[in-house]
Amino acid sequence: MSDCVLIQNLKVATVIGVLDWEREVRQELLLDLNLEWDQQKAASTDDVGYCLDYAAVSQWVISHLGGAQYHLIETAAEEIAQGLMKEFALLSIEVTVKKPGAIPEAEWVGVSIRRERR
């Protein structure tokens, strides 16, 4: 199956980084989410009640990351992937976490992970 819900460049402010100054400020992260979900019933019935609620997914991510502190974007990506898989019963997920301005020569740096239900 390859039905996916996509959320691109979700903006979340959180404490992230290993440098002393980074531990004292909130920085914006951008997240891309690729959520594998069985959309057949929603598509065949045209009923929003069978859809993955992407507003709820977005709010879960904003709430979770916004209330946390991380040293590594790798940790943030893993926690988001595991949490969303559990909370929304996803078949698989790909999470990309981008940190704008981390190095002056690049627009952003980031990590991307993919997790699947076993």
List the model feature ranges, each with a label.
Residues M1-R118:
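N-terminal, polar/charged subdomain of small-to-medium soluble alpha/beta proteins
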